[in-house]
Amino acid sequence: MANDENKQKALAAALGQIEKQFGKGSIMRLGENRSMDVETISTGSLSLDIALGAGGLPMGRIVEIYGPESSGKTTLTLQVIAAAQREGRTCAFIDAEHALDPVYAKKLGVDIDNLLCSQPDTGEQALEICDALSRSGAVDVIIVDSVAALTPKAEIEGEIGDSHMGLAARMMSQAMRKLAGNLKNSNTLLIFINQIRMKIGVMFGNPETTTGGNALKFYASVRLDIRRTGSVKNGDEVVGSETRVKVVKNKVAAPFKQAEFQILYGEGINTLGELIDLGVKHKMVEKAGAWYSYNGDKIGQGKANATIYLKEHPETAAELNKKLRDLLLHNTGDFSSAASDYVTDYEDNTEEVNNEEF
């Protein structure tokens, strides 16, 4: 017993010395004076928010979104920005690819007049800008598009064809060590968009890998794999893409959930269509034949007309969205069953979906 008391006194003295040297709060007991809830920002997709478990992307963390070309990576991040701006948050877009279309961003609901944008010349410059913005404590969301376009200064100044083995990986590794702590302190969400490459000589297993080395994989709290799985058609006209997102890593909730939704060209994620589907699944929206009803009132014949009704009555859509979020994100026990509404196994083939009721 005396030995235990001596240990407690020694521990208290050590904690006091640490706080005196490094400041109050530099060390604490995990359950003491802090919220265990993770603050999140919506992705713009209800089904993806459910699949993520915490209700969105976690603040103060690093997130990686990767996938093939034209799979919806930039669209998803622009939807995150739009959702954050609706909450009054400040966002920044680091356009390393020099390909951001402000007209398209505006169509997705982004307030381009209040969106900070940078088109850096080198990878080091892009990452220094990220660090400066996060240390300011005034920016809530930072998007980097993309890791593959973060070209080291030495490579830009060199000749085409010169070998620069491992330069990008070393640059990213150093940046991750520096950024991780600053992001946590400022509660800033940093999202990296990444591209896919093929590993040469892989006979077994997945030959796909992402650019920028392994540091980002380790430091990311959430990694999302986004794929286009088919086309959304209105008659013979292709009006969008069927999209599947898999949560391949998740440090704030259970990983390996999947979400499926539609991305409509010029409009973004079909959020109202998601509300209809989830509402029917959880018996908040009644479906009798082709007719959809909500609170006893018919809202449309066919999914397309029901979606139009919600678009014309935003207060009804907001009410249904709140009910679904309260039900499906009430506790962690609901995450698995809720995400399963949109869970399917990955398929290598890409289908065309003739969906006239988009």
UniProtKB/Swiss-Prot annotation:
Covalent S-S links between cysteines: none
User: Is rRNA-binding found in the keyword set?
Assistant: no
The signal peptide annotation in the UniProt record is none
The similarity comment for this entry is: Belongs to the RecA family.
> What are the subcellular locations of this protein?
Cytoplasm
Major location, coarse class?
cytoplasm
- Which positions are annotated as binding ATP? 67-74
Give the InterPro entries listed for this entry. Answer: AAA+_ATPase (IPR003593), DNA_recomb/repair_RecA (IPR013765), DNA_recomb/repair_RecA_CS (IPR020584), P-loop_NTPase (IPR027417), RecA-like_C (IPR049261), RecA-like_N (IPR049428), RecA_ATP-bd (IPR020588), RecA_C_sf (IPR023400)
Q: What does this protein do?
A: Can catalyze the hydrolysis of ATP in the presence of single-stranded DNA, the ATP-dependent uptake of single-stranded DNA by duplex DNA, and the ATP-dependent hybridization of homologous single-stranded DNAs. It interacts with LexA causing its activation and leading to its autocatalytic cleavage.
Q: Name one GO cellular component term.
A: cytosol
What GO biological process terms does the UniProt entry carry, in alphabetical order?
DNA recombination; DNA repair; SOS response
| The organism's place on the tree of life at top rank | Bacteria
* Xref: Pfam families: RecA, RecA_C
SUPFAM superfamilies, alphabetized? P-loop containing nucleoside triphosphate hydrolases, RecA protein, C-terminal domain
According to the UniProt entry, its GO molecular function terms are: ATP binding; ATP hydrolysis activity; ATP-dependent DNA damage sensor activity; damaged DNA binding; single-stranded DNA binding
The protein here is known as: Protein RecA
**What are the entry keywords?**
ATP-binding, Cytoplasm, DNA damage, DNA recombination, DNA repair, DNA-binding, Nucleotide-binding, SOS response
